[in-house]
């Protein structure tokens, strides 16, 4: 069965056999995090089930659907082509092709698709009450390690609520309830119209003034700015609050773009391969004395590498630049370099590694992604992004997914370096910096490596260089997460963002004030707003007739959050059931 993106749930048969899971996808689970219950269940107009537990014909969805116009609603369809084999018995039991769907929280029989996952009535009501009443549960006496099952789900409410969040239940679905489809579409149109008006109001004069301003020009005083020719929205511009100076926004755009280019080595390789000539020392703007990002204290508590496992040799994040003679790669290989600065991959990136020379001895495909480092007569081949399709039949699905996770280890270091060079990021507290990186690294990698997903060939290229078809990966156990990642990448690639736009969007993804554990929310919000304004300015400058691109980019943020939750769930299952 073909899997679509988002909200795809792993289904377990009634025998609870771990060896025979099935993956399916209903219309109601499309694009993740839809609610199938109301925030006010006592209201007859806000519930999608009748007294017998059967679904009504009312087509409604959560407020999250307002952000995605292509979502559909009813979580359990009967007799419709979009959900073949999906039935719901008179007892409220949801089945798929004869298999009983279990609650993802406690394992009880699921009554439907509630708040983003299939759940039973008990867990649905528990989660709704927890969010609506903002209940602070008593601290767990077992270090929050209680196993939540049907028989004991009421013993530890803190662990039960934690389990609800970990499996993907959406807070927003409870907070906003459900909205009829027509109302959802109307709100979406109004939101897009308001966004377009806001951008036109704030930046109507910006496009004309760009040609008059030099890069080093200081900001123009408001009085002089109002004297310049403006479009028809002149009066509205004068009345509105003036945005930050264009010079400041251009400076932010330039700094973030340089940080993205300098710390995204995979993107550099593709730019170098696509151009016939390369300027000397392209992408080598990293300062010689880069202060290391010290996360050692956080590793002891399951820090960044708890999301991206790596070997012991890759966990040194506190080293400084030194004139070493060899570079350690994640696979254990070392590259000796003469008269160059290099360092362990888990430290900072070298300011100058070697002269990159295309390999003549490799195949045409490999030569575009392979480079030689000349070290006094010794030649070391480095092929980090070989495109040669290769599937090892001897490897199990677990080993392949472990390789997939391991291959991202150096990319995680790039995200850390990128974050350090975002204007204002280093001004945040160390605690907030670490929390933003821990929570947002996967989402940044998802944006950066969207090009690894080839929609035409239906393939995924691992960072180790191996290419797998989607069908092969599905046969190895990949399901909902891979399908969601593939669809997200296809949509993001369809926007055809420039390097500058991708850089700003990546920074916006990382700096999110609603991450858990943030201490100084106001500081993070201020930085986030600065980046969003810069992104809006850039989009309006590059696409004056396509204002919807900015809206579409912002709508990708909840998609990324959904993918992040799904990834955390898969990683947890990966650790518990290797």
From Swiss-Prot:
Keyword terms, alphabetized: Acetylation, Activator, Biological rhythms, Cytoplasm, Disulfide bond, DNA-binding, Heme, Iron, Metal-binding, Nucleus, Phosphoprotein, Receptor, Repressor, Transcription, Transcription regulation, Ubl conjugation, Zinc, Zinc-finger
Maturation and modification: Deacetylated by HDAC1. Acetylation and deacetylation regulate its transcriptional regulatory activity.
Zn-finger (NR C4-type) residues: 103-123, 140-164
Binding site for heme: 383, 567
Amino acid composition bias (Basic and acidic residues), ranges on this chain: 227-237
Keyword Metal-binding: yes
Biological processes, Gene Ontology terms: cell differentiation; circadian behavior; energy homeostasis; hormone-mediated signaling pathway; intracellular receptor signaling pathway; lipid homeostasis; negative regulation of DNA-templated transcription; negative regulation of inflammatory response
Positions of region (Modulating): 1-99
Sites bearing Phosphoserine, chain numbering: 46
Modified residues (N6-acetyllysine): 162-163
Regulation of catalytic or functional activity: The heme-bound form can bind gaseous signaling molecules such as CO and nitric oxide (NO) and NO can reverse its transcriptional repressor activity.
Domain named NR LBD: residues: 368-578
Molecular-function GO terms, alphabetical: cis-regulatory region sequence-specific DNA binding; DNA binding; DNA-binding transcription factor activity; DNA-binding transcription repressor activity, RNA polymerase II-specific; nuclear receptor activity; RNA polymerase II cis-regulatory region sequence-specific DNA binding; sequence-specific double-stranded DNA binding; zinc ion binding
Low complexity bias (residue ranges): 13-47
Pfam families hit by this protein: Hormone_recep, zf-C4
Sequence ranges of Polar residues compositional bias: 48-61
Description of how the protein assembles with itself and partners: Binds DNA as a monomer or a homodimer. Interacts with NCOA5 coactivator, leading to a strong increase of transcription of target genes. Interacts (via N-terminus) with KAT5. Interacts (via C-terminus) with HDAC1. Interacts with ZNHIT1. Interacts with SIAH2.
Domain comment in the entry: Composed of three domains: a modulating N-terminal domain, a DNA-binding domain and a C-terminal ligand-binding domain.
Protein family (similarity comment): Belongs to the nuclear hormone receptor family. NR1 subfamily.
Protein name stated in the entry: Nuclear receptor subfamily 1 group D member 2
Organism: Rattus norvegicus
Taxonomic lineage: Eukaryota, Metazoa, Chordata, Craniata, Vertebrata
């Amino acid at each position: 069965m073909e899997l679509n993106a988002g909200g795809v749930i792993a289904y377990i048969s009634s025998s609870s056999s771990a060896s025979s899971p099935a993956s399916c996808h209903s219309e109601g689970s499309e694009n993740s995090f839809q609610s199938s219950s109301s925030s006010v269940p006592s209201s007859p107009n806000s519930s999608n089930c009748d007294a017998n537990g059967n679904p009504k014909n009312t087509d409604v969805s959560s407020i999250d659907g307002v952000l995605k116009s292509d979502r559909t609603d009813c979580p359990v369809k009967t007799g419709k082509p979009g959900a073949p084999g999906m039935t719901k018995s008179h007892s409220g039991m949801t089945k798929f092709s004869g298999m009983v769907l279990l609650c993802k929280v406690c394992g009880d029989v699921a009554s439907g698709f509630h708040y983003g996952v299939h759940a039973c009535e008990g867990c649905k009501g528990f989660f709704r009450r927890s969010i609506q009443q903002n209940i602070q549960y008593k601290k767990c006496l077992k270090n929050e390690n209680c196993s939540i099952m049907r028989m004991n789900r009421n013993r530890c409410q803190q662990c039960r609520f934690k389990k609800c969040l970990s499996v993907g239940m959406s807070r927003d679905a409870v907070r906003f309830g459900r909205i009829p489809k027509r109302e959802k579409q109307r709100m979406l149109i109004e939101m897009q119209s308001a966004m377009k008006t806001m951008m036109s109001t704030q930046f109507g004069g910006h496009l004309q003034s760009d040609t008059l301003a030099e890069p080093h020009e200081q900001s123009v005083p408001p009085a002089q700015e109002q004297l310049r020719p403006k479009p028809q929205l002149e009066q509205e511009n004068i009345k509105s609050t003036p945005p930050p100076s264009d010079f400041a926004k251009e400076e932010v755009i330039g700094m973030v773009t340089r940080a993205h280019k300098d710390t995204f080595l995979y993107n550099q390789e593709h730019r170098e391969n696509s151009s016939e000539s390369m300027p000397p020392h392209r992408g080598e703007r990293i300062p010689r004395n880069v202060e290391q990002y010290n996360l050692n204290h956080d590793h002891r508590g399951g820090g960044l590498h708890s999301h991206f496992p790596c070997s012991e040799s890759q966990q040194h994040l506190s080293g400084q630049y030194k004139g070493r003679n060899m570079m350690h790669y994640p696979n254990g290989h070392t590259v000796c370099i003469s008269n160059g600065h290099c360092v362990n991959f888990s430290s900072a990136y070298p300011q100058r590694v070697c002269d990159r020379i295309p390999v003549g001895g490799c195949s045409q495909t490999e030569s575009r992604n392979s480079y030689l480092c000349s070290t006094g007569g010794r030649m070391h081949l480095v092929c980090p992004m070989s495109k040669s399709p290769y599937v090892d039949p001897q490897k199990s699905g677990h080993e392949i997914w472990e390789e997939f996770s391991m291959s991202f280890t150096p990319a995680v270091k790039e995200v850390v370096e990128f974050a350090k060079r975002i204007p204002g990021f280093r001004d945040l507290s160390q605690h907030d910096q670490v929390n933003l990186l821990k929570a947002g690294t996967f989402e940044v990698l998802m944006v950066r490596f969207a090009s690894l997903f080839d929609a035409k060939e239906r393939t995924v290229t691992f960072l180790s260089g191996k290419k797998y078809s989607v069908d092969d990966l599905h046969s190895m156990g990949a399901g909902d997460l891979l399908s969601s990642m593939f669809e997200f990448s296809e949509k993001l690639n369809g926007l055809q963002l420039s390097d500058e736009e991708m850089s700003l969007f990546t920074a916006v993804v990382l700096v999110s004030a609603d991450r858990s554990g943030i201490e100084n929310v106001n500081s993070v919000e201020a930085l986030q707003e600065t980046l969003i304004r810069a992104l809006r300015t850039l989009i309006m400058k590059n696409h004056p007739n396509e204002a919807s691109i900015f809206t579409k980019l912002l709508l990708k943020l909840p998609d990324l959050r959904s993918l992040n939750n799904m990834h955390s769930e898969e990683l947890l299952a990966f650790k518990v059931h290797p």
